[in-house]
Amino acid sequence: MNTAVTLLTEQAPQPIEEFGQLERQIIIILDFGSQYSELIARRIRETQVYSEVLSYRTSAEHLRQLNPKGIILSGGPSSVYSDRAPHCDPEIWNLGVPILGVCYGMQLMVNQLGGEVAKADRGEYGKASLHIDDPTDLLTNVEDGTTMWMSHGDSVTKMPPGFEVLAHTDNTPCAAVADHDKKLYGVQFHPEVVHSIGGLALIRNFVYHICECEPTWTTAAFVEEAIREVRAKVGDKRVLLALSGGVDSSTLAFLMHKAIGDQLTCVFIDQGFMRKYEPERLVKLFQEQFHIPVEYVNARDRFLDIMVGVTDPEEKRRRIGHEFIQVFEETSRNLGPFDYLAQGTLYPDVIESADTNVDPQTGERVAVKIKSHHNVGGLPKDLRFKLVEPLRKLFKDEVRKVGRSVGLPEEIVQRQPFPGPGLAIRILGEVTADRLNILRDADLIVRQEINQRGLYNEYWQAFAVLLPIRSVGVMGDQRTYAYPIVLRIVKSEDGMTADWARVPYDVLEAISNRIVNEVKGVNRVVFDITSKPPGTIEWE
């Protein structure tokens, strides 16, 4: 159960102002609504240079104050000649900072600087071969004919003054353009996606050769600075942390404990919807192996009671979230008082919701409402904490690196995503103690068989689902009428899209045989071969 909490917000993304030494060299991405904006930031960070995603509305003056080494304009779904198309502050062209426009960002650059963009005779979507006309500067070490990913219905029809074509495709005469003197560059393709074979080389050229950045954004340096900042902020005050056993909250707990030791209190609320043996193993690991005290709260009966008669998945989430808040409130009052709440806020949370609740006297962010992956409600108004969020600059893959760096074992670092409501939303229909036991046993077999064959890290998620129906079967000479189990095993890079995994038949056979023979109440196993989209990874 992921109980790491994040602020509920509704405003546009704002920059993280409290830059440390690591972020002095920064590449800013202005977001025009692209589904790939976060991916651009991740690709920049993979080059060991810090990056942030800001709204396209960010003023040139604000950007000047941030002093970026470079700016990237993201793609987007609009046409630059549309009346409602988003435009950036035209003064950014006078900042004297290298700028790279990607897809819509390139078209916007061309449009605002005196060129022309129009609807293309033929749109270009998917893979395309890039023919390089100028192999220097931005396209250094990018092979001629390399594959790049296109997704556009508009094209540049007239170049702005001072620009020249760097590359073209069979359908796009201006696939890459540049004004070398002003260090303004544009590409019609998406170098950030994995399908663009030469994309990373292009990004590295922009970051290192054009923006002249240095590789300062490293895991070791981040950990050192985060510990220093936590100590400076918290001082000798007490900090409360909600532990779930997932990689985010576990990494947070390790980092906080390294920084402040026994000033940290970890609370694990067992709501009864975790996988078999997980609660006991988690508490034992933290207390005996990691020597981090954990306050264990057994709330299984309370959560099971509120599930009686509930079949709607959203109602399940609402009730679980509400009850979690009640238990969390009671526990914090019993163990308190606390000055700070340690949150596992990650950078995507900051991008999606950048509103802040600020204490007018101290200027610090305070937790008035919290949000978890099971959509919990707000904390009571009189239960106010100041926030400490050492992971809020990180993407998920960076959290895993930090986890390894601070000593988190690989079994937690590589733990597959698990929904906040846990098994409650992998049981379709009403959640009962009997159904929970059936699903726990079946799910354990799935994980055991996958693990034994060294396949665990091959899949984004691998789990069992219990359906609220029964089917006829035969075992021995007896007719059976029992539940079916669904196997859901998928591959994905980020969970936004997913493909059903081509699991070897012998593995599927072993899982099926064990479940129907070892799990009482199950007589059939089926395999879900639906990708996302159109389906979702979870069934509820």
UniProtKB/Swiss-Prot annotation:
Name of the top EC class for this enzyme: ligase
Pathway the protein acts in: Purine metabolism; GMP biosynthesis; GMP from XMP (L-Gln route): step 1/1
Record-annotated active site: 103, 190, 192
Span of domain GMPS ATP-PPase: 217-415
Q: Decide whether keyword ATP-binding is in the record.
A: yes
Quote the Pfam families the UniProt record gives.
GATase, GMP_synt_C, NAD_synthase
> The Glutamine amidotransferase type-1 domain covers which part of the protein?
26-216
GO terms for cellular component? cytosol
- What keyword terms does UniProt attach to this protein? ATP-binding, Glutamine amidotransferase, GMP biosynthesis, Ligase, Nucleotide-binding, Purine biosynthesis
**What is catalyzed by this enzyme?**
XMP + L-glutamine + ATP + H2O = GMP + L-glutamate + AMP + diphosphate + 2 H(+)
The GO terms describing molecular function are:
ATP binding; GMP synthase activity
Q: What is its EC number?
A: 6.3.5.2
The UniProt record lists the keyword Nucleotide-binding:
yes
What does the annotation say about its assembly with partners?
Homodimer.
Task: Quote the function comment for this protein.
Answer: Catalyzes the synthesis of GMP from XMP.
Annotated HAMAP family:
GMP_synthase
Q: Please state what the protein is called.
A: GMP synthase [glutamine-hydrolyzing]
Please name the source species.
Trichormus variabilis (strain ATCC 29413 / PCC 7937)
Q: What is the lineage of its organism?
A: Bacteria, Bacillati, Cyanobacteriota, Cyanophyceae, Nostocales
Underlying gene: guaA
